[in-house]
Amino acid sequence: ACKFGLLLKLLEDEDVNTLSSFRPILPNMDNNIFYGNSLLGPNDVPVEFAEEINPFDFGERRFDLIVGNPPYMKTEDIKKFSPNEKKLYEKNNRYVSAHKQYDKYFLFVERAVNLLKKNGYLGYIIPSKFMKVGAASTLRKLITDNKLLKIITSFGAHQVFEGKSNYTCIMILQKNEHDQFKYSEVEDFAAWRIRTEGAYSFCNREASILSENTWVLYTDKHKHLLDKITRN
């Protein structure tokens, strides 16, 4: 489906007069698109579960850039969908982020970090709740202990995905230590989409303010409101 979608994109501007050259211009994508369970490798999965789980072998591949929108799936749904898969995520502390009532996207963040080259970048759009829920404490610890956080852009109450009710953010990590990170809040989503000036507010924050505990983030623009609430 992914390959077919990309090929359709290539044909967007074609018409009846150019379709005769359609076949030659289509690239062979067999060496560019792969599929499988990227959270588990062949050595992680018993032979009897291999067909069900379809582990993916990255081998020694490491990446300069990983970008994506990983699946959001609660622990209960992982167990319902594939109980054998859930057990393997939690086996022998394979994923430190497989903690309490974790969400599957926690694992994707951890996996991506481990697949980055030194100085490599990870950019994911994920639910903002990982900054607050107790189950994500081990994921927050992984990020903060290694000072990976570079940028977080919060969409607040703006709904990024049509027909879905998710409160999301874009998180950018770099496999290098950062003493500061940039935090921004989108105030006008429609304006932000076309990169209009003033669509968001931002500030730089010290990495030392973050730990495995709940992340309370705000821009300078909203600091006075938080101070007022705190005083009261």
List each language-model region with its residue ranges.
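Conserved short internal alpha-helix adjacent to the catalytic or cofactor-binding core
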Residues: S165-C169
